[in-house]
Amino acid sequence: MTPIEREVAVRRGGPEDVVTVADLYSETRRAAYPQMPHAVHTDDEHRDFYRKHVMDQPDHTVWVAEADGEILGFAHCTPTFLDGIYVRSDLRGRGIGSLLIDVVEATHPDGYELWVFVSNTDAHRLYLHRGLVEVERTDGSGNEEKAPDIRMAWRPGS
């Protein structure tokens, strides 16, 4: 792992971050899943979703990792669920995802669960390395993308 050259800080995201966060979500999904059709939702729909259903909801938290005012990645979670860790493609493998997971674990003392697509081997490997365990695998028939996925869980002390 090559550390990033700039100092990275994590802060709670706010409404002012919605466009950057939603666009980063779109970009990272395209990079992580080149084999998947991306017409399930447009970039504008992602922005609208993050604006209406994430950034303004009291039970949703977005943690952004930034350096010099630039958002490099983010984590989106609820009290029991991690929607995902999203890091700019050109910055993967530099500890930003682990930094975000540190914050998620610190703010979820009872643990959390997440879903990861089987095809996202880098994320799956990171989550296993961080101590998450596989709970369930599906054929993807229950998700919008119809892609096989894995439910994983992290419990403190495991």
Q: Which sequence ranges carry the predicted segments?
A:
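Conserved GNAT acetyl-CoA-binding A-motif
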Residues: 107-119
